[in-house]
């Protein structure tokens, strides 16, 4: 909501009933947010990604897809870590949001359950940290274009 209030356009990518319901609740709270239609072809989704200033993504497929079209990614890492070698192609390590805890990585491919039952890797990442990372990326890219 903070980014929406600052006037940033927010596009939500996802597919599936559960994700769609979450995205619907997010756009209800954020006037500048909209859902990228899942009816777009793969090529159309890549073309749309190529227009973004930044992609915010978990260490997942969208991180890698945005990387392929040269879009900087604010990547959020939980049970995995960029040190495992899965950072997006040509992405800056500074854009990765990772807690660097002693228990990381607990998995090289992600996990839905925390072996230590605390999920500190995710619960310790504040929304403010993510927002600051996004704004830093946008500012840096605007300066590069100028």
Residue ranges and their predicted role:
Residues 5, 145-146:
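N-terminal low-hydrophobic presequence detector
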Residues 29, 35, 67-145:
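Nucleotide-sugar donor-binding patch of glycosyltransferase catalytic domains
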